[in-house]
Amino acid sequence: MKIIIAGGTGFLGENLEKYFTEKGNEVYILTRNPQRKNEIYWDAKTIGEWKNSLEKADVLINLTGKSVDCRYHEKNKQEIYSSRIDSTKILQKAVDQCSEKPKIWMNASSATIYVHSEKHLNTEENGIIGDDFSMNICKSWEQEFFKIKNTEIRKVALRTSIVLGNNGGAFPKLKTVTKLGLGGKQGRGNQMVSWIHIDDFCKAIDWIIQNENISGIINITAPGPVSNETMMRKLRKELKAPFGLNAAVWQLEIASLFLKTETELLLKSRNVYPERLIKNGFKFSYPGFEEAILNLLES
């Protein structure tokens, strides 16, 4: 297959590139800073020569978007919004100009589109979508993606949870704070954490490509969300950390100022279930949190 990954130089893109290349596929990366032969320049805003790479592509995956791991002041909020909307808009324009369009287009979204929920399990069908900055970003992103219907292209929005891997994302940071004795619960610890092992993330993307009946919205998350308190306890156990200091909300607020991030990333309860993956027969290699982190710690 010929696979194009827009914004593919980050944690998820690197792992997808490795996964699909090892399976014998041609993978090309659209990036602002091309360094390798398979990397193609684009600015994620305007049509350029990169458009030609979409011709006869089997798969287009768009992961473009400024990281949400920052303070939500007006400049950052605008960049978070525009980086997602503009890239989706220009890809649609490029796809429309293709004579032989990609067969499937997967666009990043986020499991944070669902409301803070400790009890209600959010599925694609019965998930409750709320109204704040993060949720509205996701809603606008998906609306832009699905705005134009191309009958010959299968579109899938990936509502992805926290992805756990050793070479990026949240897991290396969680390991570090736990080893430093700071691996207690954050806030009340009741907030649910939806997560997925990086291997299952890549496998799920491959599975969606192969299953032509899958389109629309899909939750990319493991079937076993855990509370923040449980997550940190299991991490302490596997890392043999004798204790872990808890962090109250006020402490997290102060720390987030110094770290230039938002407490929402730790305190929001993301209680999400991959109903469509499960119902359609996808098999997780790591359905449980403990087995997932054991594998990562042994890797």
State each model region's role.
Residues 129-133, 161-168, 188-198, 209:
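Glycine-rich "substrate-gating" loop/helix at the edge of Rossmann-like oxidoreductase active sites
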Residues 208-259, 294-297:
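Mid/C-terminal beta-alpha module of Rossmann-like enzyme folds, strongest
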Residues 143-166:
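Conserved beta-loop-beta element that borders a ligand/cofactor-binding pocket
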Residues 175-184, 191-225:
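Alpha-helical substrate-binding/gating segment
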Residues 40-87:
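NAD(P)H-binding glycine-rich loop region in Rossmannoid oxidoreductase-like domains
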Residues 242-243, 263-299:
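C-terminal amphipathic/interface module of NAD(P)-dependent oxidoreductases
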Residues 89-131:
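Conserved Rossmann-fold NAD(P)-dependent oxidoreductase catalytic core, especially the SDR/UDP-sugar
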Residues 3-23:
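N-terminal Rossmann NAD(P)H-binding glycine-rich loop of SDR-like oxidoreductase domains
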